[in-house]
């Protein structure tokens, strides 16, 4: 794994946590007014770009026959599904526990929060069935329930299918690049059609999750092949120059996220800038790469998948104090919430993510 990209993944996961707490859960406070937090959902697109680049790097030469494709799917399934299933169940269970506590308090004449217990729909059997088969984010439902960030997980799962099929049947590098570029162009055309008013106007996962994932994922694939093409000529590029390029792209990426509401159609340039940022980090040296390789960010990167999936369960328990308390006490709640997320992520990483990932590797190796 490229360590700087691992660290970048950790930063992205933490930003999504802040978005869901301050914006989606309506915790408010000063951070909810910052464009970087309001638009932190865009870091999911960065996840897709990173995933495309890493898949092309690791599996570009490994999908040559049916046995290798089978091993790929087994490893991907065991990498994603066990933690997805557990966190879906814990997210549902957390709501039942919290709403049950509110109901019990109401019976004693104590009101916790503004809503009545169980007043908001929190479980839908049809959505749960789609979650079980990883179809909740591909456009079959018009909402995101339960462990709602997992919509992107379902998109990623089917992106792996598209990637494996493409790379199995298309063997030459040139053809793969052209095919990936065609997918990117088609997705971009789809979103420009949306922006022009000819398509669904809500940029939500239920409508646009799959094209959104396809666009960013195959930008990532192109990033890897672009790096492969120029790597021999850039081998002697100084770390100072490379670091300056990384810094410009990091600042540009964060600025575009912050200004998202004012960009108009240029918002669709953000995944391409993400792609350039990831491209600049592939050598794993330079000032930004060094920052992302620090121990705290590496820890976040290693645990990023668990952080991403477990934080909604934790957020459910902190939702009422997060909204009730004003500043500055709110930030004490935020600090405890983040620590609880990191602790929960450590537990799920150690006891669910890693053991099942290793089981998948062993099972894939038997073929």
Predicted regions and their residues:
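Specific transmembrane alpha-helix
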Residues: 44-60, 152-169, 180-235, 267-289, ...
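Juxtamembrane transmembrane-helix termini
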Residues: 44-78, 83-109, 221-228, 314, ...
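Alpha-helical transmembrane segments of multi-pass integral membrane proteins
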Residues: 213, 217, 222, 240-354
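Functionally critical transmembrane alpha-helices in membrane proteins and complexes, commonly lining
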Residues: 3-62, 81-84, 88, 126, ...
């Amino acid at each position: 794994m490229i360590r700087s990209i691992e660290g970048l993944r950790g930063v992205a996961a933490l930003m999504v946590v802040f978005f869901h707490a301050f914006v989606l859960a309506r915790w408010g406070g000063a951070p909810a007014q910052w464009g970087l937090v309001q638009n932190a959902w865009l870091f999911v697109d960065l996840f897709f770009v990173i995933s495309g680049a890493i898949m092309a790097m690791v599996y570009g030469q490994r999908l040559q026959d049916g046995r290798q494709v089978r091993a790929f799917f087994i490893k991907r399934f065991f990498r994603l599904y066990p933690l997805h299933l557990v966190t879906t169940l814990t997210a549902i269970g957390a709501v039942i526990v919290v709403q049950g506590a509110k109901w019990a308090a109401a019976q004693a004449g104590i009101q916790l929060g503004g809503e009545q217990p169980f007043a908001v729909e929190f479980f839908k059997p049809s959505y749960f069935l789609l979650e079980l088969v990883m179809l909740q984010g591909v456009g079959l439902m018009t909402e995101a329930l339960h462990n709602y960030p997992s919509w992107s997980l379902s998109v990623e799962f089917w992106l792996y299918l598209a990637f494996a099929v493409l790379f199995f049947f298309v063997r030459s590098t040139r053809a793969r690049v052209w095919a990936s570029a065609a997918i990117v162009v088609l997705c971009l055309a789809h979103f420009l059609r949306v922006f022009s008013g000819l398509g669904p106007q809500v940029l939500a996962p239920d409508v646009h999750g799959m094209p959104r994932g396809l666009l960013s994922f195959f930008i990532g694939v192109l990033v890897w092949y672009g790096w492969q093409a120029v790597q021999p000529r850039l081998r002697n590029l100084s770390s100072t120059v490379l670091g300056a390029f990384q810094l410009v792209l990091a600042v540009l990426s964060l600025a575009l996220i912050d200004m998202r509401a004012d960009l108009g159609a240029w918002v669709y340039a953000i995944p391409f800038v993400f792609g350039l940022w990831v491209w600049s980090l592939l050598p794993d040296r330079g000032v930004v790469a060094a920052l992302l390789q620090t121990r705290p960010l590496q820890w976040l990167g290693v645990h990023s998948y668990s952080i991403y999936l477990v934080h909604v369960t934790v957020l459910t328990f902190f939702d009422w104090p997060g909204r009730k308390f004003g500043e500055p006490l709110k930030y004490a709640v935020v600090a405890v919430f983040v620590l609880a997320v990191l602790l929960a992520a450590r537990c799920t990483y150690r006891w669910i993510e890693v053991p099942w990932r290793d089981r998948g590797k062993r099972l894939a190796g038997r073929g």
